[in-house]
């Protein structure tokens, strides 16, 4: 009776161990057949973002932005959510820029559109979008959306941050900063 229980327990342990491997193997087949991503694509899954370095039968190998190597089981990739940032030829870049209350919005919009027009990596179709996004506690937020080729995304994103900061300063468009008013109690 005890030996039968031991054999049964051993079989359960083996089944559990094999089920993970079989799930990863099946996931690998699904990934290889459906091709939701390919080597060189930038993907995100399970909170990890990286460039696909290699697709193997049991796992996919990613290289992160800081050059870490991550092995993700294909079972998890085939049954979970995968965001592929490289799949489409274009991507939309978005910025939310806070300016001071009292700034002339027409001037802010015109300056922003001029900055966008000067960057040849930004596509004209679909047309860039600039609008007043929100009236926050200490800033008037402007939203900017523009389409770029996928490979230009990060370059445009960071370059525009620098350009907007520089040009807005030259144009006298102020950026807000949080302020705290302290009232001193009288004794």
Q: Each PLM stretch: what is its role?
A:
Residues 30-125, 140:
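Soluble accessory domains appended to multi-pass membrane transport proteins
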Residues 16, 46, 102, 150-151:
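Residues at alpha-helix boundaries and the short loops/turns that link adjacent helices
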Residues 103, 113, 123-187:
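Solvent-exposed, non-transmembrane regulatory segments of membrane-associated proteins
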Residues 17, 21-32:
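Membrane-spanning helices that line or support transport/gating and their immediate boundary helices
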Residues 1-8, 12-13:
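Single conserved hydrophobic/aromatic residue that forms the stacking wall/gate
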């Amino acid at each position: 009776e005890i030996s039968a229980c031991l054999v049964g327990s051993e079989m359960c342990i083996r089944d559990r161990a094999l089920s993970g491997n079989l799930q990863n193997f099946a996931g690998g087949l699904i990934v290889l057949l459906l091709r939701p991503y390919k080597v060189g694509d930038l993907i995100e899954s399970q909170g990890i973002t990286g460039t696909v370095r290699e697709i193997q039968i049991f796992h996919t190998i990613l290289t992160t932005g800081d050059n870490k190597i991550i092995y993700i089981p294909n079972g998890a990739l085939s049954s979970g959510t995968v965001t592929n940032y490289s799949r489409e030829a274009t991507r939309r870049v978005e910025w939310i820029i806070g300016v001071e209350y009292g700034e002339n919005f027409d001037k802010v919009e015109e300056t922003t559109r001029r900055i966008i027009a000067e960057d040849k990596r930004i596509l004209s179709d679909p047309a860039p979008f600039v609008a007043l996004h929100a009236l926050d506690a200490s800033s008037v937020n402007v939203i900017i959306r523009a389409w770029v080729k996928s490979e230009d995304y990060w370059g445009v994103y960071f370059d525009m941050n620098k350009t907007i900061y520089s040009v807005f300063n030259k144009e006298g468009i102020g950026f807000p900063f949080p302020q705290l008013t302290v009232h001193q109690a009288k004794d």
